[in-house]
């Protein structure tokens, strides 16, 4: 099954393999994903599952959200996410169904999507890995500047998309082909080898790897 689930980044730790090798892992909590809507080709033009997970205080839920959750007959969650379905996939899943971490029991590798940590306004060296200029040898002002950003009279402008200083991080990032180290269905935990995008407690989308 190639359906993705929504999880929460708990943090990183390490576990030891049988041969004593230390494996760095990220712990992802995947509580029950409750299906709030099933989108079909006939009504929506594409096939997808809309899911929610976790909980949300009643006074933080808008009336449209409350009506949507009530119509689906599920408890209000901390957000709504959509997972696309391939042809012939998930046809037996109905509104109100619950999807759990055990669907990854037979999956070897996953892709994890999240929002990267925000770094604020950064220069070209940190943001784009530009090379710094000389600290001495006559350079007294331009140690960490971007350098030339264009040509001369032709074209007489800076091209769109030029890598320059600006806001870094806080964008959607996907890390591909992470090994699944352990699936703990009792505690709703998924352990994957290596790091995943985002800060602790950030929301993640976990899907079977497309390039595995």
Curated annotation (Swiss-Prot):
<keyword id="KW-0689">Ribosomal protein</keyword>
<keyword id="KW-0694">RNA-binding</keyword>
<keyword id="KW-0687">Ribonucleoprotein</keyword>
<dbReference type="GO" id="GO:0019843">
    <property type="term" value="F:rRNA binding"/>
</dbReference>
<dbReference type="InterPro" id="IPR019926">
    <property type="entry name" value="Ribosomal_uL3_CS"/>
</dbReference>
<dbReference type="GO" id="GO:0006412">
    <property type="term" value="P:translation"/>
</dbReference>
<protein>
    <recommendedName>
        <fullName>Large ribosomal subunit protein uL3</fullName>
    </recommendedName>
</protein>
<comment type="similarity">
    <text>Belongs to the universal ribosomal protein uL3 family.</text>
</comment>
<keyword id="KW-0699">rRNA-binding</keyword>
<dbReference type="InterPro" id="IPR019927">
    <property type="entry name" value="Ribosomal_uL3_bac/org-type"/>
</dbReference>
<comment type="subunit">
    <text>Part of the 50S ribosomal subunit. Forms a cluster with proteins L14 and L19.</text>
</comment>
<dbReference type="InterPro" id="IPR000597">
    <property type="entry name" value="Ribosomal_uL3"/>
</dbReference>
<keyword id="KW-0488">Methylation</keyword>
<dbReference type="GO" id="GO:0022625">
    <property type="term" value="C:cytosolic large ribosomal subunit"/>
</dbReference>
<dbReference type="Pfam" id="PF00297">
    <property type="entry name" value="Ribosomal_L3"/>
</dbReference>
<dbReference type="GO" id="GO:0003735">
    <property type="term" value="F:structural constituent of ribosome"/>
</dbReference>
<dbReference type="InterPro" id="IPR009000">
    <property type="entry name" value="Transl_B-barrel_sf"/>
</dbReference>
<feature type="modified residue" description="N5-methylglutamine">
    <location>
        <position position="153"/>
    </location>
</feature>
<comment type="function">
    <text>One of the primary rRNA binding proteins, it binds directly near the 3'-end of the 23S rRNA, where it nucleates assembly of the 50S subunit.</text>
</comment>
């Amino acid at each position: 099954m190639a359906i993705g689930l929504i999880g929460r980044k708990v943090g990183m730790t390490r576990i030891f393999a049988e041969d004593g090798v230390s494996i760095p892992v990220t712990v992802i909590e995947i509580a029950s994903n409750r299906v709030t809507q099933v989108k079909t080709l006939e009504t929506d033009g594409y096939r997808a599952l809309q899911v929610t997970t976790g909980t949300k205080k009643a006074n933080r839920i808008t009336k449209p959200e409350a009506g949507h959750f009530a119509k689906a007959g599920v408890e209000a969650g901390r957000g709504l996410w959509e997972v696309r379905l391939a042809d012939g996939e998930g046809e037996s899943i109905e509104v109100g169904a619950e999807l759990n971490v055990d669907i990854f029991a037979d999956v070897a590798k996953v892709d994890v999507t999240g929002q990267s940590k925000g770094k604020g306004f950064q220069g070209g060296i940190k943001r784009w890995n530009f090379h710094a200029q000389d600290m001495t040898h006559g350079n007294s002002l331009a140690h960490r500047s971007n350098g030339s950003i264009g040509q001369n009279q032709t074209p007489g402008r800076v091209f769109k998309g030029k890598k320059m200083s600006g806001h870094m991080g806080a964008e959607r990032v996907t890390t591909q082909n992470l090994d699944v180290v352990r699936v703990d269905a009792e505690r709703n935990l998924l352990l994957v080898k290596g790091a995943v995008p985002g800060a602790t407690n950030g929301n993640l989308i976990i899907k079977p790897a497309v390039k595995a």
